[in-house]
Amino acid sequence: MKAVSIYPVSESALTICLGNELNAVVNDRVFRLYNHLRKQVNPFWKDLIPAYCTLTVVYDIKEMRKHSQSAFKWVSKQLKEAIDQCDDAGILPSRQLSIPVCYESEFGFDLKSLSKAKKLSIDQVIKLHTAQTYRVFMLGFLPGFPYMGIVNDKIATPRLSSPRKLVPAGSVGIAGNQTGIYPLDSPGGWNIIGRTPLQIFNPRVSVLTDTSLLQPGDEVKFYSITKEEFHSFDQENFNPLSA
């Protein structure tokens, strides 16, 4: 297991690096620590920002200096102890979700060009995309935007050289070896290959409920639906955990 490195990013924040590879093992370490720190009733932590392999901790510099002249050293010591506890906690439980996607040309703006670039038929691209189970590594870019991987090398492709001014909510795209879903209408540079009718972000839900359907650590599998199924989709009665 890679040694932990901790480095300051400002007077009142530091980043913990738990690995340098995009994989579930490292990502699990990040979110075990993230969940552990979130559960603590600790006035020192002002914000926790998880990513693929890192966790950035923003802390109350005034409170920290009551304990030590070097806030960075004091916080680092506390976090190293927390990491040791978390590394003994085992694998994080994950949810399995099934998400419908319509890969018709009116939704998959870049499906034809991607298939041509990869010397594959459109059906082959769809089969490769739906064959894989993807891990949600993190949320970012937009509220509830899931960064998922890892995409089959045969359909992995760089971002568009010129981003679109508008990508509709629900659009499913590929960028590099990752796939993602746009939760809102937004500009974007991912290669759009389809669209899900499922609303994955709802800012108007109860404060006791996650506004984002997908959470880090979830496992996602896509399945293909027709245009008719897309337009008749029943959001209210659909459960992605049992689809």
Regions flagged by a language model, labelled:
Residues 1-88, 93-243:
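Glycine-rich active-site loops that engage anionic ligands at enzyme catalytic sites
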